[in-house]
Regions:
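Carbohydrate transferase catalytic cores enriched for Leloir-type hexosyltransferases
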Residues: 1-260
């Protein structure tokens, strides 16, 4: 079997969706070494290492043109290359699939990470919200199978799009093996010293932005004992200023630590 992947996020994204994409490709390449895995993506050096295996190949867009040509190829004109490489299944790893594949012999799978642009629309700019709504709705209506990464996402797909549960499979995201390697006491002490960490804290990792809802964590701090702190790690946005103001207003500023 030949499986194609929308590898854009695997190539250009260093955070959640990029990590998910790379781990899915790596896991399938090991579990099914007889299958060919074809990564359809831009002509760019990957920001993080892609899986390397004999059954993994990269497929590029036409050499002419730039970003516009790539997006047209990715979203509208991929069918020719899918036929060329004999792709049996095409997996859209981040809420979208190309148009027109329901008229081709290639079957399609799409992973839906969340519908937060519908559940929390105020956390997105209007243009991005409209783009995500259009692409995700199309993917859910036309994909042969939908993978939801959580029960909440599956429920939202059924609620907002009216998709039957028979078309949805809940497959939780994998965890990098590094998180199963216990840190030594010396390593813990070194990190605590480097970042001036308190003895007890809740760790919150993710871009510091409104839809991540770090606000709720800060609001909860007054309800627990004063020895408990919050350590918030992630890329800062202007939302961090709002969180710092909230921490001062709730008298927990000394217990909230930002690392970016």
């Amino acid at each position: 079997m030949n499986i194609g992947f929308d590898a854009k996020k695997a190539i250009v994204n260093l955070t959640g969706i990029g990590n998910y994409s790379r781990r899915v490709i790596a896991a399938l390449s090991k579990a099914y070494p007889a299958d060919g895995l074809f990564l359809f993506g831009p002509r760019k050096e990957p920001k993080a290492a892609l899986p390397v295996a004999e059954n993994v190949s990269r497929v590029y867009p036409p050499a002419f043109g730039g970003a516009i040509t790539y997006e047209l190829w990715r979203n509208r004109y991929l069918r020719g290359d899918l036929r060329k490489y004999g792709i049996d299944i095409y997996h859209g790893l981040s809420n979208e699939i190309p148009t027109g594949l329901d008229k081709s012999p290639t079957r399609t799978v799409v992973t839906i990470h969340d519908l937060i642009f519908l559940t929390r629309p105020e956390t997105f700019k209007a243009g991005m919200r409209m783009k995500l709504r259009k692409k995700t709705l199309y993917a859910c209506r036309h994909a042969d199978k939908i993978i939801a990464i959580s029960r909440q996402t599956a429920d939202d797909i059924m609620r907002f799009y009216g998709i039957g549960s028979d078309r949805i499979a809940i497959v939780y995201q994998s965890i990098d093996p590094i998180y199963f390697t216990p840190a030594t006491a010396e390593e813990k002490a070194a990190v605590a010293s480097r970042y001036s960490l308190p003895e007890r804290y809740v760790l919150c990792v993710g871009t510091i932005e409104k839809r991540k809802n770090q606000e709720l964590l800060i609001k909860a701090l007054p309800a627990v004992d004063a020895g408990m702190h919050a350590v918030i790690v992630g890329r800062c946005t202007p939302y961090a200023d709002e969180l710092e103001t909230l921490a001062r207003q709730t008298a927990v500023a000394e217990r909230v630590h930002f690392l970016s």
